[in-house]
Amino acid sequence: MRTDMLRELERIVRLAGDMVREAHDIEQVTTEKTGAADLVTKYDVAVQGFLKRELLTLLPEADFFGEEGEHAALTRPWTFIVDPIDGTTNFVRRLHYSNISVALAHDGQVAYAVVYDPFADQLFSAQKDCGAFCNGLPIHVSDKDMAHAVFLCGSTIYDRSLTEQNFSLLRQLYDRGLDSRRF
């Protein structure tokens, strides 16, 4: 069952998705944060600013922790955790594999989460102890046997010290599953 808080988070994140979908001049406004693989655009900053305003209007007593340099002290019971454009490298190259990620944690535990792909109009949301949803419909973990499963994985591009561990885990999944995909 989705509560009013989850519905409000979904609404706000969809509005942020409109900003991402309507972006232009992306290539001309890109800068590096910590290296060539860690990019930020004016849209990352604008979407994060929008989300901060809207989310703190929704829950003013919360802290805000944003990927683009907005790291609160995290001393309050409620904290918003935001990645305004998760997949900026794809976004800059106009590959439509980016999303907006927002979580609301209470006392260090995620209570609500919303991940929205504005290009596919897929909104995933979850509420602690209430299940997960895709575009409002309940979803669940697959019950397929691992031998018949296809795995999707990411990597640790920002911390190369974890590369060996990452690929070791991927190898274990690959050996036990049907196939793997990396996006």
Predicted regions and their residues:
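N-terminal subdomain of lithium-sensitive/metallo-dependent phosphomonoesterases centered on the IMPase/IPPase/PAP
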Residues: 1-85
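DPxDG-like acidic metal-binding loop motif
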Residues: 74-133
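An extended, acidic
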Residues: 141-183
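Short, isolated positions in well-ordered beta-strands
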Residues: 111, 139-141
